[in-house]
Amino acid sequence: MALFRVGPLPDGALAAAARFHGEVLPRVLAELARGENLVLVFAPADHTHRGWRLAVVQQLAREHAPLRVNALAAEDDAAVAAAEAYLASAPGVTGQYLPLDGNGAGGLLSRV
């Protein structure tokens, strides 16, 4: 399972979605062409970003099945690592956008 860190995007949801589709998506598609399951890692953002991020990950998962594509929103490396480990052990989970809270998320997910 490959991690793809999206990198900084504008604060506004519309501008962030536009930059993602114009600049980041081609790199994501190239990564998926390698044939490995993929986890996108976004920086945390407010609720206005949820819709476009979820739509992206769901469409990528549909178009690239049987590969699995999921997305996380987190800054905490331990939370990202725990979620990545969970997703690696959950073969039926795909097309999900999971905002993470690093406060205890690592321990909770590692017990699953």
List each language-model region with its residue ranges:
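C-terminal helical subdomain
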Residues: E23-P26, L54-A55, L67, L72-V112
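Catalytic loop of short-chain dehydrogenase/reductase
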Residues: M1-A65, L72-D76
